[in-house]
């Protein structure tokens, strides 16, 4: 069986690219189609597969400025020819799911999210954009939304990465979807005996929507030790925000081994973003450590309040402070058991993802076969 995997872009490695790697364990000989591909940043991960890029790859600085090419993405993805393939699988948070496939070829879309910047977060993105970007957003986005909806109707099987995203798919595309949680590679994340438990951790790319500022402000006000792990555009402003607070340290980008050690020994992970799913909270839980999280988005499906962590209801520092105090009160009573937390995280393993995805692909193939027979 000849399989194509379509991914929005391969310019860095994150949770979405991890999903592609797991799908490749089911279909190791699949060809990969993508808008643009930066081999230097992706490394050797997909070196054993044919990677086909769009015509946009030829543009200068395409791998750096790909987000500015939204207007041209629909045509780029629709230009890929899948007439010689038996199965097409899309991994999409943007336009990848809009490919056109032959009638007898199953088209499965694993959706990380419908385009945030086209739908419910349009005004947030617009507010943070420069004048020129706003000019084009105001003139192009209605057309992008129309294409996004229309292209979603030609997918045979829609898979959402969480119930939260399934609700967004129903809202914006008027489609039902099944939920298969992303694979979490938990092998290296394990509990340790006698963790130090003398600091909190905030780990992510340091970009605005991750809201690391909330963790910084909350721990600064409470005098709690906080280790901020990661790098990004907000790093300088966050360090300025934490100035004078000796209890807050920044590590920058670190190795997986060091990250694991920090998670294994922390009091808890503080997670302030509204994410579609959020793998980091599960990595912390796999280490047996609880999570203090903003109670909105996919994290509501991966953290059990009062058992594997606590939620705070508002995306503010004051709400996070109250959650930290609540967490510490519960922790003193022995509410959070390392073994229970790690066992909960194990239910999101890669093995589970592969099993569920295989079953979904089998159902998609059967549905398309029945459709072809009836015609």
Predicted segments with their positions:
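Nucleotide-activated donor-binding/catalytic signature segment of Leloir-type glycosyltransferases, i.e.
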Residues: 236-257
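Acidic donor-binding loop of glycosyltransferase active sites
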Residues: 264-276, 289
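Short hydrophobic beta-strand element within catalytic cores of glycosyltransferases
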Residues: 270, 290-295, 303
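Conserved donor-binding/catalytic core segment of Leloir-type glycosyltransferases
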Residues: 192-210, 216-227
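A charged, aromatic-enriched C-terminal amphipathic alpha-helix characteristic of glycosyltransferases
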Residues: 315, 332-369
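Active-site donor-binding segments of glycosyltransferases and PAPS-dependent sulfotransferases
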Residues: 29-97
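Conserved acidic donor-binding segment of nucleotide-sugar-dependent glycosyltransferases
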Residues: 305-306, 310-317, 325-332
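Membrane-proximal helix-turn-helix segments that form the acceptor-binding/catalytic region
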Residues: 127-158, 166
């Amino acid at each position: 069986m000849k399989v194509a995997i379509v991914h929005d872009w391969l310019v860095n490695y994150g949770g979405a690219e991890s999903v592609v790697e797991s799908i490749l364990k089911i279909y190791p000989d699949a060809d990969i189609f993508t808008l643009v591909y930066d081999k230097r940043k992706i490394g050797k991960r997909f070196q054993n597969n044919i990677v086909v890029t769009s015509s946009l790859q030829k543009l200068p600085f395409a791998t750096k400025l790909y987000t500015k090419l939204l207007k041209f993405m629909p045509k780029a993805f629709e230009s890929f020819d899948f007439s010689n393939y038996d199965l097409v699988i899309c991994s999409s948070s943007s336009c990848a799911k809009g490919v056109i496939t032959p009638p007898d070829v199953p088209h499965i879309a694993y959706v990380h999210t419908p385009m945030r910047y086209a739908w419910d977060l349009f005004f947030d993105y617009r507010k943070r954009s420069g004048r020129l970007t706003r000019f084009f957003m105001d003139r192009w986005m209605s057309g992008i939304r129309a294409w996004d909806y229309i292209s979603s109707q030609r997918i045979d099987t829609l898979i959402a990465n969480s119930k939260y995203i399934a609700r967004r798919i129903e809202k914006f595309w008027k489609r039902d979807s099944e939920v298969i949680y992303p694979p979490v590679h938990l092998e290296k994340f394990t509990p340790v005996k006698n963790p130090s438990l003398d600091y909190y951790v905030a780990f992510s790319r340091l970009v605005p929507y991750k809201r690391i500022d909330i963790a910084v402000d909350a721990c600064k006000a409470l005098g709690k030790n906080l280790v901020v792990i990661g790098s990004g555009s907000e790093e300088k402003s966050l360090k300025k925000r934490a100035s004078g607070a000796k209890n807050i340290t920044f590590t920058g980008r670190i190795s997986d081994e060091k990250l694991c050690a920090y998670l294994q020994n922390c009091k808890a992970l503080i997670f302030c973003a509204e994410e579609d799913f959020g793998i980091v909270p599960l990595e912390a839980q796999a280490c047996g450590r609880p999570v203090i999280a903003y109670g909105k988005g996919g994290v509501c499906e991966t953290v059990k309040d009062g058992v594997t962590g606590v939620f705070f209801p508002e995306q503010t520092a004051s709400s996070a402070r109250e959650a930290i105090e609540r967490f510490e009160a519960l922790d003193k009573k022995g509410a959070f058991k390392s073994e229970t937390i790690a066992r909960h995280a194990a239910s999101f393993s890669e093995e589970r993802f592969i099993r569920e995805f295989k079953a979904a692909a089998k159902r998609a193939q059967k549905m398309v076969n029945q459709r072809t027979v009836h015609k």
